[in-house]
Swiss-Prot record:
The keyword Signal does not apply. The gene is accA. This is Acetyl-coenzyme A carboxylase carboxyl transferase subunit alpha. Component of the acetyl coenzyme A carboxylase (ACC) complex. First, biotin carboxylase catalyzes the carboxylation of biotin on its carrier protein (BCCP) and then the CO(2) group is transferred by the carboxyltransferase to acetyl-CoA to form malonyl-CoA. HAMAP family: AcetylCoA_CT_alpha. It is found in: Cytoplasm. GO terms for cellular component: acetyl-CoA carboxylase complex.
Length: 326
């Protein structure tokens, strides 16, 4: 079983510095009081109230560029962390039966509540060595073919599919292209539109381009409050349009990457609330919110027959965009 990430917030982000200074001060006062056996409850209460107020104000209306930082926080719970917190009887399955086992995409069998399911998702690393092994959460073709093998298994045995999305994008190396990266993603899309079992997708961190969409064709798309989902990362968009990374903020605003924007556009069906400061501050609470939403939507989908679920999924995506000849 994979060790869960720490609930400690970790290094502060740019916009969190004032809050981190207050929280560090609180820790110092508590330590001093404990070591010297003195009562500092009044001072603590004042600073805690100030920190709580600052936290509310800070996270109430974050701009897209700051939400992007939260979504990329290395302390944020990963797919394997959520599987541990959400599921019982987890059995990981490996390999695509064609080339190899891609550690950037994990999946297997588990029990969610009373429901046996196939659950999968992108997996980033926790440190440099782990990130190299998992390719920073960017799957190769064999990762998507492993996902397809698991989804075919789920459809054959009438098991719901749960997909957790957290990737900067599919691996863009020459080796991946030589092994058919585009074909692997396209085939996943084709098959996911054909399945009759319920498919629930949730963006838990980054949702980057086709690398996210390759396991993102669901009857329901859920998204954490401080996650992002986009056709391209703001970094890459800035480089392509302006030839440098100085315009990330402008790109992030234009791309509509936040859960709030995507809910308004009809891409996301439900925004899952996060603990104040992000899911990494209280992974158990974040997982409880995710589990409640998944079970509620799953119960709704299980009341429908297979052809209805398939048609609903197709119509959901057909309604997302239209083109006009000019």
């Amino acid at each position: 079983m994979t060790q869960s990430r720490s609930a400690t917030p970790g290094p502060s982000l740019d916009f969190e510095r004032e809050l981190m200074e207050l929280e560090t001060r609180l820790d110092d006062i508590r330590r001093f009081a404990e070591e010297n056996n003195v009562d500092v409850s009044t001072q603590l209460a004042e600073i805690e109230a100030r920190a709580a107020e600052l936290r509310r104000d800070l996270y109430a209306n974050l701009p897209p560029k700051d939400i992007l930082q939260l979504a990329r926080n290395p302390k944020r719970p990963s797919t394997l962390d959520y599987i541990q917190l959400l599921c019982e009887d987890w059995v990981e399955l490996h390999g695509d039966r064609l080339f190899g086992d891609d550690l950037a995409l994990v999946g297997g069998l588990a029990r969610l509540g009373d429901h046996p399911v196939v659950i999968m998702g992108h997996q980033k690393g926790r440190d440099t060595k782990d990130n190299i092994q998992r390719n920073f959460g960017m799957p190769q073709p064999e990762g998507y073919r492993k996902a397809l093998r698991l989804m075919d298994h789920a459809n054959h045995f009438q098991l719901p599919i749960i997909a957790l999305i957290d990737t900067p994008g599919a691996h863009a190396g020459v080796d991946a292209e030589q092994r058919g990266q585009g074909e692997a993603i396209a085939r996943n899309l084709q098959h996911m539109f054909s399945y009759e079992v319920p498919i629930l997708c949730a963006v838990i961190g980054e949702g980057g381009s086709g690398g996210a969409l390759a396991i993102g064709v669901g009857n329901r798309m859920l998204m954490f409050e401080y996650a992002v989902y986009s056709v391209i990362s703001p970094d890459s968009c800035s480089v392509i349009l302006w030839r440098d990374k100085k315009h990330i903020e402008q790109a992030a605003n234009a791309l509509k990457i936040t859960a709030r924007d995507l809910k308004q556009l009809g891409i996301v069906d439900e925004i899952i609330p996060e603990p104040s400061g992000g899911a990494h501050r209280d992974p158990q609470r974040a997982a409880a919110n995710l589990k409640e939403a998944l079970l509620r939507h799953l119960d709704e989908l299980l009341t429908l027959d297979g052809p209805t679920r398939r048609t609903q999924r197709y119509e959901k995506f057909r309604a997302m965009a239209r083109f006009q000849e000019i």
